[in-house]
Amino acid sequence: MLAVLLALGLALRVAAIVPYAMGPNTYSDDNGYLTSGITFARTGYIAYADPGLQTTAIGPGMPLLLGGLIALVGADPAGLVAAHIVFSCIGLLTAIAAYLLGALLCSRVAGLIAAGLCVLEPALLSVNIVFLTETPYMCLNLFAIYFLLASVREWRWGRYWAGVLCMCGAAFFKGLGLLALVAPAALLLRRRENLRPWLLRACAALAAFVLLFIPWWVRNGVLTGEFVPFTANRGDIQLMGSYIGFGYPEGTYEEAVLQSDREAWEQGYQDDMERRFARRGEMGKERLWQWFTENPLAFVASHLLYKPLALTVSHLRTVDLMPDRLMALVWWGCLALAAWGLLCPRLGGCARSGYYAPAVYLLVATLVTAVYAPLPRYGVSHVPIWLVYSGAGLQDLGGRALRLLRGKDEIH
């Protein structure tokens, strides 16, 4: 059954890609990542939108991944279509991870439903077919959570190292990948296990992480003279986030951008995009501090309630696969099923050890991600975990419906 779902997912993704002569492109961040891949394949340098400018604005993950694909299939139109298809298959690996996690926490049926939802959910399909970091990140992140939870449930070095390497791989795309540790930590605390053996294991994981990232840190230090662990903050998201929520200081994001651009021209650094984005970050921090000091209750409510909720209910559409309202309706339905999946174990539903550990991760990751701007693109990384609970919820509802029908048949 899982193979059938994966075949269906591949067919849908290929059908969504091939109408575009060079593969779908939103001419936004994905275009910058494509440029970074082509640049890395040809020069070995990590750049972004400008092929001639090395940068720390993105992590090494996308240049390495896309650079490898471009080196294999080329950058001509047919090669780009092939690269999109191969890239979208990573989304199908995410469905496999959802199946494994659902089976680990609930049942194989719940895992199959979760995998099917990952294959069919419009936002995930929409993201999988374009070159965005979210596709490889959420795949590696979900596998990391699965392997780390499995190693806590039944210790094996192989599982543990698989989880650690997947987590480090996710961090190559987004530094938030390290938050995967929250899930096994929650399970360890819940089970009140002796943590001494885990100190040695944690040290081994830390050593592996440092060894993997040392080349990146050295490269960034030589390039910028600073320690940049993952990526340099581009600043515009910080500024944008200071205009989202309750009771924030007056003004608009567009006005602030115009002001920062005017300063850049007046002070002669209009061609230095890194410095211009850094200035926006400074303006964002100033506004956030002003917001906190002038209206602390609104600031706290915005960051603990409004932004996380906005991040959760939003959905991302990169290309026109279906009407936006229909995509929103599908996502709301998945969230409703996930809510029931989180509740049903308290009402006699199926749940195995560690069932709520990914939910703890989801809470922490949502709060951290929503600190700045709760953009739909940032929320899509959490969709597969929501769908794992959606699968559990749908299985539980189906089981209750079957029992109800059988009860009626026995009465008659």
Indicate where each model-derived feature is located:
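Transmembrane-helix motifs of polytopic, lipid-linked glycan transferases
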Residues: 7, 85-106, 139, 143, ...
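Short helix- or helix-capping micro-motifs
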Residues: 9-12, 87, 114-122, 126, ...
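Membrane-proximal lumenal/periplasmic loop motifs of glycosylation machinery
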Residues: 18-31, 42-67, 290-291, 295-299
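Loop-to-helix entry region of an early transmembrane alpha helix in multi-pass inner-membrane enzymes
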Residues: 56, 60, 64, 74-93, ...
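Transmembrane-helix signature of polytopic, membrane-embedded enzymes
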Residues: 81, 95-120, 139, 160-162, ...
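Short acidic/glycine- and proline-prone juxtamembrane loop motifs at membrane-interface regions
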Residues: 123, 129-137
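Membrane-interface transmembrane helices that cradle and orient dolichyl/undecaprenyl
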Residues: 144-160, 170, 189-192, 394-397
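Membrane-proximal stem/loop segments at transmembrane-domain junctions that anchor or position
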Residues: 221-307
